[in-house]
Amino acid sequence: DYGLDRVTSTAYDLFLQYSGTFPSGYRATQLANPNLKWESAEQFNIGTDFTLFKGSLYGSVDGFVKDVDDMLINPAYLGALGEGGASWANGPSLRNWGMEFALGYRKNLACGLGLDVTANLDFFRNKVTYLPETSTGSYAHTTTENLVESGRPYGSIVGYVVEGIFQNQAEVDASGQPNARVGGLKYADLDGKNGITADDQTWIYNPVPAFSYGLNIALNYKGFDLSMFWQGVYDKDVYNNQKFQTDFWSITDAGSNKGNRLLGAWNTNNTGSTIPALTTNNTADEGRSSTYFVENGSYLKLRNLQLGYNLPASFLSKFKMSSARVYLSGQNLLTIKSKSLTCSDPENPDWNYPLATSISFGLQLGF
């Protein structure tokens, strides 16, 4: 059992921020739920490790299935309840499953070169297996299909499909899209009713990558050693919230400065642009959830690279040292990502700082 430590079942808990003193006023933020209980989980694992050819070839295979019941959620509530109508409740059941594979090779070659290379690949999937009727509206995009029926993973997002940019007034008039504009985003009419409504939404975002992978390489030769670690994910959706600032003028902070991507926005002399035309208002609601913000977040990163040298014993004996090693190390040195990804770091598509690149020099001594 786990999870209840993250939420409260009462309506009276007080949370103090900043100064740590009681504020001069209070407001209701949620309703009590005396029936709230802990989430429960059951997990099954199976795996094996192996070594072959006197330890030169080694690896492992692992698999797991994990079922979580009575998940804690904060479902939508009736607007008539007003402020403080939210309430934590036990809701969906979720099944997670996945596998991990690792394969390595180590060898000391006749030339004096030692190597140890390990590659790993893993994937996991999840599926909502139960969703109470009271929660269906929080996890559905039509009146008939919810997360259970769709087979989509937990955390999937619904939204509108962007077909492109309106090139002229004739396209706007024929679309039936409310408040459409020339140079604005054109949404797909999925239900074929000649207009854009909530029923034209579909599943647009999958939070689970196809697989993750890594590669460790360690080499040594006559006192020198070199190690590196590569890590990546493949076929992962990223919901790029930075586009609110980089691709639009009026969705948020209309009075603030913007990025240089706006210089390439659509206009009558730049009709091939995929960035909507600039506007001082957002009457077309172009910040709504849509495929415009979903990008390919696949990447490969050089997480760590280190070069070292162990001083010879003949030198160390003069100073009564047992070991001495100097090294140069770097972290987050290289990122290979999709050309279609517009944010700088696929791991930080929001407004967090990207992972910093760092380089360090070190000396290790033993006596």
Label the predicted regions:
Residues 1-152, 285, 289-367:
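Extracellular/periplasmic, surface-exposed regions of secreted and cell-surface proteins
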Residues 213, 227, 236-238, 317-319, ...:
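C-terminal region/CTD detector
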Residues 3-16, 135-139, 169-170, 218, ...:
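Membrane-proximal, glycine/serine-rich, low-complexity loop/turn segments characteristic
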Residues 3, 89-92, 106-207, 238, ...:
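Conserved small-residue
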Residues 233-325:
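Extracytoplasmic gating/loop element in the C-terminal half of outer-membrane beta-barrel translocons
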Residues 21-53, 58, 148-229, 274-304, ...:
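Outer-membrane beta-barrel transmembrane strand signature
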